Swiss-Prot record:
Native organism: Gloeobacter violaceus (strain ATCC 29082 / PCC 7421)
Annotated glycerol binding sites: 88-89, 140, 244-245
The protein's name in its UniProt record: Glycerol kinase
Regulation of this protein's activity per its record: Inhibited by fructose 1,6-bisphosphate (FBP).
EC number: 2.7.1.30
């Protein structure tokens, strides 16, 4: 992979913007790769009706401006480049002349287009869409969301723009001059042809999405545009655009086949780099772009789990058995095991490797002796078991056994969860000191793309590792429990038909 050469004396900082599902984060990275400043704002979630999830695009932009202003107030360093990473699949429509959105963005978790997805399957589109895009037909992806927006919010007119969250923020950062996305985000829309590396005309026609409303597709790494002077007080290059999971993969140094990372957030996402060619999964994993530069494109296999950290939130908000998410660790550790209780976290259906929109959550094995501790432990074990399902599928598709799992995301602070994960997988689990790895990946991409940093391998190797969890004495017991949990998964399948 080709990067610009670093200058002899590097000064300033790289600004990473992480436009996540639950929050907007800005981090400044100094020349050593350390975090020099940071700011965060929570994104309000909008639930118009059951199964629908939306975000206000204007709020996302306002919060972005706030975190940028805050990190600039914390550090006088001049921003040498901007890197951007974002929640993928979430999409919106807006007016080019005014920059005003046509309603809220539809979030990746939103299931309102499930019926359209079923119709596409019934019409025989499953195999063609899989072959072209590497994805399964699911309401998770942008394609059916955009079709819904055009049908229900605003039909096509000259000057209508559409895009994912990266495109929206690039539009705003550049003062409306640039309408673009990168290959990693485009590959998550179910409209991007992996073989031509462009929007697929037949799929656009199928869903009545005009090509002219979509952003131009650019490399993930390298200078894409310049910020409007009103954003920072001066202009700076936007030089790294990556979907959040690809950004984490980049930060972990997973740039070749056999390296796997898992991000534990609201959902969990396991991604393995597969090299310079797309591999079609035989186990219901997604084929996607890892990242690209001006000369090459790397590919990946991904398993998306819809409900992991959200399961812990359900313990707090739904059952009320904990007051904060952090309490889940102590509560689960207060009992030696789950007491035969198993949890299937299909609260929004099942993602990889099942892709069952009709599956529903299941808590089974309850007796009069079951209490809060057993339920909390069953939830943490279920997160580890789900991850095992996907790592097994990755190993089968790639023909390479998993030897180490690199992890990041808010839930990895839970030491019990990480130990359970190591035991269930039977391999070391590596946790870095900086668990905001998506922002770090965006910073690395922007810095390497502008010559702020010169060597990718050295940059990755310099990241401090906080702890490596080794599989322990409960490995065999938990792997036996995994087999029982798989029976519970089968009971949860196709509950809603």
């Amino acid at each position: 992979m080709v990067f610009a050469s670093a200058g002899a004396a590097v000064s300033g900082a790289i600004l990473a913007l992480d436009l996540g599902t639950t929050g907007i984060r800005a981090l400044l990275f100094d020349p050593s790769g350390a975090v020099a400043a940071g700011a965060y704002r929570e994104v309000p979630q909008i639930y118009p009706q059951p199964g629908w999830v939306e975000h206000d695009p204007q709020t996302i932009w306002q919060l972005t401006c706030e975190v940028v202003a805050e990190v600039q107030a914390q550090s006088a360093a001049r921003i040498a480049a901007v890197g951007l990473t974002n929640q993928r699949e979430t999409c919106l429509l807006w007016d080019a002349a005014t920059g005003t959105p046509h309603g809220n963005a539809i979030v990746w978790q939103d299931r309102r287009t499930a019926a359209l997805c079923q119709k596409l399957r019934a019409e025989g589109w499953e195999a063609p869409i899989r072959q072209r895009t590497g994805l399964v037909i699911d309401a998770y992806f942008s394609a059916t969301k955009l079709a819904w927006l055009l049908a229900h919010r605003r039909p096509y007119y000259p000057g209508l723009k559409a895009g994912t969250i990266d495109s929206w923020i690039i539009w705003k950062l550049t003062g409306g001059r640039v309408h673009a996305t990168d290959t990693s985000n485009a590959s998550r829309t179910m409209l991007f042809n992996l073989h031509t590396r462009d929007w697929d005309p037949e799929l656009l026609e199928l869903l009545a999405i005009p090509a002219e409303i979509l952003p131009a597709i650019k490399p993930s790494l390298g200078v894409l545009a310049e910020t409007d002077v009103r954003v920072l007080g001066y202009s700076a290059p936007i030089a790294g655009i990556l979907g959040d999971q690809q950004a984490a993969l980049f930060a972990h140094g997973c740039d070749r086949p056999g390296l796997v990372k898992c991000t534990y957030g609201t959902g969990s996402f396991l991604v393995a780099h597969t090299g310079d060619r797309p591999i079609r999964s035989r186990h219901q994993l997604l084929t996607t772009v890892a990242w690209s530069d001006r000369t090459s494109t790397g590919y990946a296999l991904e398993g998306a789990l819809f409900t992991t950290g959200a399961s812990v939130q359900w313990l707090r908000d739904g059952l009320g058995i904990i007051e904060t998410a952090d309490e889940s660790e102590a509560l689960a550790a207060s009992v030696p095991d789950s007491g035969g209780v198993y949890f299937v976290p299909a609260l929004s259906g099942l993602g990889a490797p099942h892709w069952d929109m009709g599956a529903r959550g299941l808590l089974i094995g309850l007796t009069r002796g079951s209490g809060r501790g057993q339920i909390a432990r069953a939830v943490l074990e279920a997160i580890a078991f789900q991850t095992r399902e996907v790592t097994d599928a990755l190993a089968a598709d790639m023909g390479t056994p998993l030897t180490r799992l690199k992890v990041d995301g808010g839930a990895v602070r839970n030491n019990l969860l990480m130990q359970l994960q190591a035991d269930v997988l039977g391999v070391p689990v590596e946790r870095p000191q900086l668990i905001d790895t998506t922002a770090q990946g965006a910073a690395f991409a922007a810095g390497l793309g502008t010559g702020f940093w010169g060597d990718y391998a050295e940059l990755v190797a310099a990241r401090p590792i906080d702890r490596v969890f080794e599989s322990g004495e409960r490995q065999l017991v938990l792997q036996a429990h995994y087999a029982v949990w798989q029976r519970a998964v089968e009971r949860s399948r196709e509950w809603v038909r």
